[in-house]
Design a protein with these regions (language model features):
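Catalytic micro-motifs at enzyme active sites that drive phosphoryl/nucleotidyl and oxygen chemistry
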Residues: 106-110, 118-119
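Short acidic/glycine-enriched loop/turn segments that link adjacent beta-strands
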Residues: 38-42, 113-117
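N-terminal strand-loop-strand beta-hairpin
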Residues: 43-47
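Short beta-strand-to-loop elements that line the ligand-binding cleft
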Residues: 34-37, 108-112
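Glyoxalase I/VOC metalloenzyme domain signal
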Residues: 1-7, 13-33, 48-106, 122-195
Length: 195
């Protein structure tokens, strides 16, 4: 099993990179960590802390998606419900709630989900977002809480990875044969930074 360290990044799309920067950096407070590309084909990454990034591709012609209530089922092809960003404390949650409201964005009242307290809103691209702070006495990392009333067979096997459900690797790439090819992000190393 690989050792996962968390999410590295989530990549989304925008047709208005300026509004996206103003929202995520200047209103929400995620520092701009990296950028590359040229007009019409740019990528920007905001640091969400602990090595996790929120990335946006700027694609001309992309329009904000229709707002969809968080957690409500839809039918047909669909890829994701909402993006949740962790906050350190209840004070951060209330401060961000007030900032979103003052900036004219719809924002929910805080909700108690048992292990987190959350507010909900939408970014300028129509992306459904949640901001959550932990409930200190509940730690799902060390004490998972599986309370589904009708779990399927896979869930009944418990929270930890279970062996034997996928074929074993029989022909791993040998260290001397491993190659990493340059991608667009190589510009982070090859080009001088503007800041």
């Amino acid at each position: 099993m690989p050792s996962c360290t968390g999410f590295n990044h989530l990549a989304l799309a925008t047709g208005d990179l300026e509004a996206t920067i103003r929202f995520w950096r200047d209103l929400v407070g995620l520092p701009l960590a990296a950028s590359l590309g040229k007009p019409g084909a740019r990528q920007y990454f905001f640091s969400a802390g602990n090595g996790a990034y929120l990335g946006f591709f700027e694609w001309p012609g992309v329009e904000p998606i229709p707002e969809k209530d968080h957690g409500y089922p839809v039918q047909g092809p669909f890829g994701g419900d909402h993006l949740a960003i962790g906050l350190a404390s209840p004070e951060d949650l209330w401060a961000l709630r007030d900032a979103l409201d003052a900036a004219g964005f719809w924002v929910s009242e805080p909700l108690d989900h048992g292990f987190i307290h959350s507010i909900y809103s939408f970014d300028p691209n129509g992306i459904a977002i949640e901001f959550s702070c932990p409930v200190p006495e509940v730690d799902l990392e060390t004490q998972p809480r599986l309370v589904d009333r009708d779990p399927g067979p896979a869930a009944l096997e418990g929270p930890q990875p279970q062996p034997g459900h996928w074929p074993p690797v029989t022909e791993p790439v040998q260290p001397e044969d491993r190659r990493v090819y340059p991608g667009e992000g190589r510009a982070f190393i090859d080009q001088p930074s503007r800041v």
